[in-house]
Amino acid sequence: MKRIVLVLLACAALLPAQTRKPTSSKLISIKVTGSTRYTPAQIIAATGLQLGQTVNDEDFKGVSQHLGETGAFSDVAYSFEFNAEGIKLALQVKDANPFVPVRFENFVWLSDQELADKIRTREPLFQGQLPVGGNLADQLSETLQAIAIEHNLHGRVDYLRAGPQDGPVEAFEYSISGAPITIRKVSFTGAGAAELPLLTAVARRISGQDYSRSRLTLDADKNFLPIFLQHGYLKASVGPPQPKVVEETADETQVDIAFDITPGLQYKLSSIQLSGNTNIFPPEKLRELIHLQPGEPANAVQADQDVEELKKLYGTRGYMGVQIQPTPETHDTDSTVTYVFKFQEGSIYKMGDLEVRGLDSKATERMIAAWRLLPGQTYDSGYSKVFLDSIAGQFPPDLWKIAVRETPEDQDKIVDVSLRFDAKR
């Protein structure tokens, strides 16, 4: 709950009429305390007060209310005192929490720095984050709309509170609607000769799409960065998309996108180590499923794929919650890396309930009878494939689609299985 408190240090009502202080006077100083997020200068700028202007208690009440309504502060108190020169104002604030990041989805006409600078001249409390409560998010939307009008942009600025459904707000996402913003081409700086053709090939599908910073950032993480991780550049990074307007009409804005690549060192694999409890399976069995090759560039994407195969292996013994962490220990002096695979097998899961869907009652009964993994037995994640192979004669794959869904229940340490049969048309 936000609190706004006032303290009047000059009790004018107690003074004789001939010595009573004026209700309005010149503002000669402002002192701000209590915030670790903002500087006094930023908070003073947010008040809108100017030294030398004539002020009174009503002005200070308005300032306190304004600061409180932004959501940036959980408490706002003020006091003031008179002297022969004018009024001294003291503001005591307490920072509110939480704050979350702000994302600008498609403001392609200004760089991030230019946009931030323009915002800060109008919204001194903006620092790249906003409080989840209060009206500062609305104020920022109005500021962005004003900036858009200054640049003769006729779209409407809106924002979304991003986050999981029924979960906390994780970010504010601002965008401008109107004429489409289309990607013409994508380029990369900093990429090596071996990686550049691969990047260019992946980027071709982006050309012609609407510009979306969040989608491009996802592309960078999911499609561009793995190209470097596959080739041993374990510390590579892909910078944010940098749009440049190349053509603009009333109906469309076209942009070129540049990504700045920082590959870093290329690491070659020196050795593989297994740690944790590796007694469930012989070490040589585990190593058979790890395809990294000593002396070759360390393929981090392959390491993640190998982990999935190792998890499947552990699942055949009921370890459905096994944790396997591949950790690269890099050595920059000789550009080598030791990959350490740490195993935490967790608990053994048992077979739970079996559900069969999509068949008539008799066929359902036959499938339940044919399923040999009984409730309470140690679960085998490989059994479903064995089962599907055993019924392939009754349900040929070219005529039937059979989906297997495994649902581990962590509390009871069981796995419920659902088999869905759909006839292909």
Residue ranges and their predicted role:
Residues 8-17:
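Hydrophobic h-region of N-terminal signal peptides that target proteins for export
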